[in-house]
Structure formats: C-alpha cells, structure tokens
Regions:
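Glycine-/small-residue-enriched transmembrane alpha-helix faces in small-molecule transporters
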Residues: 1-44, 154-181, 201, 303-310
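Cytoplasmic-side transmembrane-helix entry/capping segments in multi-pass membrane proteins
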Residues: 10-14, 72-80, 128-140, 161-162, ...
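Transmembrane alpha-helices of multi-pass small-molecule transport proteins
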Residues: 35-88, 115-119, 170-178, 192-210, ...
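Hydrophobic transmembrane alpha-helices of multi-pass small-molecule transport proteins
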Residues: 54, 128-150, 265, 277-296
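Hydrophobic/aromatic residues within transmembrane alpha-helices
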Residues: 30, 42, 46, 96, ...
Length: 310
C-alpha cells in the first residue's frame, strides 16, 4: 500500500463524513423552510430512494444483491438491521435535528461508539482499557456540558432533542453490530441497500407515503435530492471505497469530520448560535471517540479470536 493510496483513502473518507454532516444541515434547512415536511416523510423518501439506487448499482457491478434473500436467517438479519439499526440512526437523528439543530444532534449521535463499548463490556465481558475508560469519562463530561451548560439542576436543551439524539446514538451501535456477520459474505452495497430499502418500505406502517401530500418548491426538492444523493449514496460509496486503502480505525477517526462539518455549515449558513459549553462539550466527545478509535485494535483482535474459535 503506497502513501498515495493511503492519502486517497483518507481524502475519500474525510469527504464522505463531511457530506454526511452537510446532509444534516440540509435537513435542518428543509424543516425550517417547509413545516409540512416531517422527519418520518424525509426518512422514508431518503431510505427508499437511496436503497434502490444502491441496489441498482450493486446489480450493475455484479454484486448479486438478491443472493442475500436465499437464506431465511440472512433475510431476517437484513430486516432487523433496517428496522433496529438504520431506522433509529436516520429517523431519530432527523427528529433531533427538527426539534434542535444539526450540530447538537450530530454530536449526541457521535456517542454511539461508547454504547458499543458498553455492550461488549456487559455481554462479551471485554473489560474497558484505560484509554477507553478515559474516553468514556470525557464523553460523559462533554455530554453533561452540552445538556446542562454547567448548571446541573436544569437542562439547556429540550428533553425531546436529548431523547431523539440518544436513540440515534443507540442506532449507531445497532447499525454497526447487527449487519456485521453479513458484510464479509454479501458486501456493504447489498447489505446497506437492502437495509435502507426494506426499512423505508416498513415505515409506511406509521405514515403511508401515498397518503402524505407535501408540496415542495424547486429549491426544497433540491435539498431532498442533496440529502439522498450527496448525503447518502455518494458518501456511502466513497467511505466503502476508502476502506480499501485505510484501516477501519483510521476511518473511524475521520468520522470526526461529520459533527465538525455540521457545526461549521450550520453556523455559516443557518446562523446557529452555539455556546462555549456546546463547543467544549462537542470537542470533548470528538476527542473521546478518537481515543476509542485509536484503541480499536483490541476489538479487532477480539473479532479475529472469536472467528477462529467458531
């Protein structure tokens, strides 16, 4: 692997994460411009459209996306991935953006890796290392600063934002853990494409798209397309391609560009006002996730041992 390949991977992953952050800003703009647009409607449109595009792309590159349905167990896992992983990470995130703003929603969602660490501690008996422990304390303090602004007897953000943001962080964990057994066999394009598409279809139970009449201007449709194409499909393909050049631990470090881009673009284009507590708390959470990512080799070695045992 040459240095040029490594830099290419870093660049691809960085741009992908920035695009994910920008999609949150685009959603926040859309919610502000058109109050008839709901988080549920936007999530359905995003998931169904992006999922269909990824599946078509998978078919074009001969990834055989329909192979995943030949076994009942893999089909059920795809459905659970969509409903328990992708729905909370996308719908709950958009709800947090709608009731709050993109930077705060993205930063709270960024706590997802620590939920994964807690899961492995409780159910896989993996004791956190010292760096992980330090990271968890940093993340807790950062969250406390954002939520209370230093006043421990009151909340500085709406409880609704905190609840939706917390659910989206849990979604990050389930979104990572549930599809893991499927990825080596079927590939990320097929697994993610089906997860998005199935989840988007299932969300019609709560609000059928054909019964929702939302009138959008050309500019608002442009924001929807930006969220689908530049905020979902393109960054996913770029990030998946980047993993061919860089380690997953390096890629997860670059995830920090998502809350950073959401913050910068929200301040520039939406005039979102963030307090010193928000900025310091967000910085602590981002640094905490970096500490966790740098310690990721231990978790990777754990997976290798488990695979060897089975």
């Amino acid at each position: 692997m040459t240095r040029q390949h490594h830099l290419r991977g870093v660049l691809l992953a960085s741009i992908a994460c920035m695009l994910w952050g920008i999609s949150g800003v685009a959603a926040s703009t859309l919610f502000t411009l058109n109050h008839h647009v709901t988080a549920l409607w936007l999530t359905q449109i995003r998931m169904i459209s992006a999922g269909a595009i990824l599946l078509i792309w998978g078919q074009l590159i001969h990834a055989q996306p329909f192979q995943i349905w030949r076994q009942r167990a893999t089909g059920l896992r795809v459905i659970s991935y969509g409903l328990l992983g992708l729905v909370p990470v996308q719908l709950c995130y958009f709800e947090a953006v709608k009731f709050g703003n993109a930077p705060i929603a993205t930063i709270i969602q960024f706590l997802g890796p620590f939920i994964i660490s807690i899961y492995y501690f409780l159910f896989k008996h993996m004791t956190p290392t010292r760096p992980e422990g330090i990271g968890m304390v940093m993340a807790f303090v950062g969250t406390l600063l954002i939520v209370t602004h230093g006043h421990l007897t009151s909340l500085a953000i709406s409880p609704v934002v905190l609840i939706w943001g917390g659910l989206s962080a849990i979604g990050v964990a389930t979104n990572t853990l549930i599809p893991r057994p499927l990825l080596p066999k079927f590939g990320a394009v097929a697994v993610t494409g089906w997860g998005l598409f199935v989840a988007g279809i299932c969300l019609n139970v709560f609000g059928p798209l054909w019964r929702v009449h939302v009138t959008l201007t050309a500019a608002e449709w442009g924001l929807v397309l930006l969220i689908i194409i530049f905020g979902t499909v393109i960054p996913f393909l770029m990030f998946a391609h980047a993993l061919g050049y860089i380690l997953p631990t390096t890629a997860s470090l670059l995830d920090a560009f998502e809350p950073l881009s959401a913050t910068v673009f929200s301040v520039i284009f939406l005039n979102v006002q963030l307090t010193t507590f928000d900025l310091v708390g967000g910085a602590l959470i981002i640094l905490a996730v970096m500490v966790l990512s740098l310690n990721g080799r231990k978790m990777m070695n754990f997976f290798r041992r488990r695979r060897a045992e089975t």
